[in-house]
């Protein structure tokens, strides 16, 4: 089989407060995060949003220690996975590729080439597939493969999602059981699954399978848990006025409070590592919402991090991927079924000189409009909630 590598894909996060603005710029520069009908606005808009949002984001990161722990946790996961694979007889080198901050995916591929890896398993640390997470990372890898002919020598296999993996479900159920054991009457605790949201249009118009996979994952976790508790699934991290997947976490918490629910256990279902959405958004912001709603006991299940059952489940995914037929990048980023990722041809400036000139003029007009809005504090971007 030759030298085998595993590439773990994740979002990335700012290590220090000074990293927050460039991290946000990278995030909002991704057309799978903000879909614009005119792509020449992507970079100016990303610059504007990252500039205006950086101070508030820095305050949030300051509440959790001044930076994201995601890189260190992902490195620990990679080390644990490599060790577990070695224990069961597989010599594998594990790499980390982050989408929006160091170590970037491009850096990981450079190390993979240097180490002369011949077989590569690409494993996103997102249990459920979304255009905006795994899909975006797969798109980057597809472009890297196109631009570097030497990578064609590497046989790769993709794992699009693994929300229904038995080991993953068992690890989640184990964490939930441990936390329920701290309540005096665990069977009456309301279990609250909070998933990262996406715009409703991603599901309705682009065919993103994320909502379906989240809902099925929730059902499977409860089946594996095998307890009588009532439960709710809601979606967090909404940005702007457009409709996202519902119910929203803050609204669902308020509704539970109105129903007289006093004890809830929050499950961060789409996160396998602690980061800003768990440590700050859930632990601080949503805790305040719950307390104001009259919920007396608000507790959260920790992220999986390096839970032994979870790491073993990742190892089994890798082993299975080495022997099974795999998807290609194109099958994921350009599927025949009704799923539409952002068309890359929209990034082309035009086929003629005249087209390029007019696009350039329009880009300049758009950029000037953004600057005017930045100075005045009024305009369409403020109206829709992006600024």
Curated annotation (Swiss-Prot):
Family assignment from sequence similarity: Belongs to the ferrochelatase family.
Pfam families xref list: Ferrochelatase
Binding positions (Fe cation): 196, 277
Keyword Metal-binding on entry: yes
Cellular component, GO, one term: cytoplasm
HAMAP family: Ferrochelatase (MF_00323)
Taxonomy, superkingdom: Bacteria
Functional pathway: Porphyrin-containing compound metabolism; protoheme biosynthesis; protoheme from protoporphyrin-IX: step 1/1
Compartments (UniProt record): Cytoplasm
Record protein name field: Ferrochelatase
Gene Ontology MF: a single term: ferrochelatase activity
